[in-house]
Regions:
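Low-acidity, Ser/Thr- and Arg-rich intrinsically disordered low-complexity segments
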Residues: 1-18, 22, 26-27, 31
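Intrinsically disordered, low-complexity segments enriched in serine/threonine/proline/glycine
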Residues: 8, 26-29, 38-41, 49-50, ...
Length: 665
């Protein structure tokens, strides 16, 4: 807050008058001259949130527990953070100022009292009824979402986006009347710190007109709209307005630091054009292949939209704690940067013509892992933060009652033996495409190989981050082999320096060990862990990294076993059987979309093309109307499960589409 604003506020507080309020609260009524502010300070206990006068608007009771199905959410991004907007017109998830920050709208994992911003035709906010039609789409090759509402009285188009490249995050919602007239309703419930903090909300006047300003400690947001919503029940702001044919009404929500002056209104026409141009220019680099171009392009756009533009870090998903099993405890925070996901993204970007983005991700990877080679983590914060302590938000009931809601991720402390292999495989592909190593990048890769060498006998938690005891996971051992193999290739084929003989010896030793202990002749399959009879969908990665050919008899035997043990009744693939594999959690989850895409890729690469296409088309049908995918799919309820949108699923889709397109060639 500026010195002038602070001075005015202090003066107002000094001259305020207090009176008793309901529920034993003590209220202070004051005005701030010159700023057009008239507020009530409500003091309860130790916390002193300041709120605008709670005018009650008849008929505007707050609607609670309206969380939509996961697939009903659209996603928009400004490359700093992102928002989820339900088909019912409610923004139920937005974290500020970046992907892994606290939420301002947190109804997704709570109730409407934990923050949301509804904008929809009046009387239709509980559910989309038969009296109204709703259609939505992205403008081609962008993350600008259009929702067309047809009601009994008229038709409106709502355009929603987050401008790219400004100094701070802005959420734009434009309402255009197309036919007749439509009464629109908005309900703004601002709740900072994952729904725990009710901000100080007041009206201000500036050169751009009237606005609502909300402040909570270091954060502030401001709504510019005409008309502004009025103070409603439970410290919400609600209102209705009518849009006639040919009329356009704009709403813009700005996020900024509370110690800064409120930002001016933006030119929405210009912002819309600039944002559309950005996304279309970016996606124009995509090298089209034929089949599944629309799905691959959207998947690449999702990967870009989950990327923090300044740091280059890509988050695994926009959300935390969307359940893998509804009502269960498998709820994790995915708003961080996994080395595995970043490495796979680097591969996908390079394969499809996004060379600059691939280099950006390489640089993020190298910065994140710089330092002690004995201390490489599996995941980092958006800027490379190492400490991501996990805690439970007990005040949030969770998505459809799926508790606990977690922030942070305790897996950052886990040892997962596969991660260095993922990174080394991706960086080797960059080398093979002509990207030269510098002294810094190759030194760090040598350090990574030293990390593998130092941990070569160590058991791990595996790719699925199991919270049970550490074991010898076959996939992890294969990825350690892949790391050493790419080191050997770098010396032999690219002339880089390194202890060739030692790396080759370690590589060959790992291969012999895996073939002896990771393959069961009894079931004719590789196994999840050494000495077990359980299988795991991660075994489909073995041919992807060149450990064996896709059509090797041992791989084909493994595929047969996976089909027998892990395919569900709808033909989608589970990661593993949670009932029999001890992962430290209660059993129960749904088919994993990335693994199912891996199976489609395996089919395509071994001549089972018709089966690959059937599975691919089945999987495409698990996405929503906007082309977005979650982590898992509940085939019984025909609905998405897990965090969303999920980078890993989109990455696997790209690989499967590439394999099928190679079959056409």
């Amino acid at each position: 807050m500026s010195d002038k604003a602070a001075e005015l506020l202090a003066s107002a507080l000094k001259n305020s008058r207090s009176f008793a309020g309901r529920e034993g609260a003590r209220r202070l009524l004051f005005s701030i001259g010159g700023l057009g502010i008239d507020v009530v300070l409500i003091v309860r206990g130790q916390k002193k949130p300041v709120r605008e006068s709670a005018r009650r608007t008849p008929g505007c009771a707050s609607v609670r527990n309206m969380t939509a199905r996961i697939e009903d959410y659209g996603f928009i991004s400004d490359l700093r953070t992102g928002a989820l907007i339900s088909r019912q017109g409610s923004i139920d998830w937005l974290c500020l100022p970046r992907f892994d920050s606290d939420s301002v709208f947190g109804a997704l994992v709570g109730t409407t009292d934990h923050g949301r911003w509804l904008l929809a035709p009046a009387h239709e906010n509980k559910q989309v009824s038969g009296r109204m039609q709703v259609e939505r789409r992205y403008l081609p090759s962008t993350f600008i979402m259009e929702t067309r509402w047809r009601t009994a009285t008229g038709e409106v188009l709502v355009t929603e986006f987050m401008p790219i490249g400004g100094s701070g995050t802005v959420m734009i919602r434009r309402v255009q009347g197309l036919h007749g007239h439509v009464v629109m309703r908005q309900e703004l419930v601002l709740r900072f710190s994952y729904g725990k903090v009710v901000p100080w909300v007041h009206r201000i006047h500036d050169d751009d007109g009237e606005a609502l300003l909300a402040i909570a400690g270091p954060q502030a947001v401001m709504l510019r709209a005409d008309p502004l919503p009025e103070a409603g029940p439970d410290y919400s702001h609600v209102g209705e307005f009518t849009v006639e044919a040919g009329q356009t009404l704009d709403l813009q929500l700005h996020a900024f630091s509370s110690h800064d002056m409120p930002p001016p209104a933006i030119d929405i026409d210009r912002a819309l054009q600039t944002t559309a141009t950005y996304w279309r220019s970016w996606s124009s680099n995509y090298l089209r292949q034929g089949n599944y171009d629309r799905e691959v392009e959207r998947s690449l756009l999702v990967l870009r939209a989950l990327t923090h533009e300044r740091t280059g870090g890509i988050v695994a998903a926009l959300t935390t704690s969307l359940p893998e099993h509804f009502g269960g405890e498998r709820n994790w925070d995915y708003r961080y940067c996994w080395l595995r996901d970043a490495a796979l993204t680097l591969e996908a970007m390079m394969t499809h013509g996004f060379h600059q983005e691939a280099l950006q991700w390489r640089n993020w990877l190298l910065r994140a892992i710089a330092g002690d080679p004995h201390d490489i983590q599996i995941m980092y914060g958006v800027s490379g933060e190492r400490e991501l302590p996990e805690r439970v938000l007990a005040h949030l009931p969770g998505y459809e009652g799926s508790a606990p809601v977690r922030v942070g991720n305790g897996a950052f402390r886990q040892y997962q033996g596969d991660v260095v292999g993922e990174v080394m495989v991706a960086l080797a592909k960059l080398r093979n495409r002509g990207v030269h190593e510098d002294h810094f990048s190759w030194t760090l890769q040598r350090n990574m190989l030293l990390f593998v060498e130092n941990n070569i006998k160590r058991k791990d938690h595996g790719i699925w981050e199991m919270r049970g005891e550490q074991r010898d996971f076959t996939h992890s051992r294969v990825m350690m082999w892949a790391a050493m193999d790419r080191g050997v290739q770098a010396v032999q084929e690219h002339g880089l320096d390194g202890p060739l003989e030692r790396w080759a010896e370690l590589r060959d030793g790992l291969r012999a060990e895996i073939l002896e202990q990771g393959f069961s002749r009894e079931i004719n399959s590789f196994t999840q862990t050494y000495g077990s009879s359980e299988v795991d969908a991660s075994l489909l990665v073995l041919p992807q990294v060149g450990f064996l050919a896709y059509d090797d008899e041992r791989i084909l035997g493994t595929v047969s076993r996976l089909e027998r043990d892990l395919l569900d009744g709808s033909g989608l693939l589970m990661r593993y059987r949670t009932e029999s594999c001890l992962d430290g959690l209660e059993p129960g989850e749904h088919p994993f979309l990335a693994c199912s895409f891996w199976l489609a890729e395996q089919y395509a690469r071994t001549g089972r093309v018709s089966e690959a296409r059937r599975l691919m088309d089945r999987l495409i049908g698990c996405g929503n109307d906007l082309g977005l995918f979650s982590e898992e799919y509940d085939t019984t309820g025909n609905r998405m499960a897990g965090n969303y949108p999920q980078a890993f699923s989109h990455l696997a889709l790209i690989r499967a589409a590439d394999a099928l397109n190679r079959c056409r060639q």
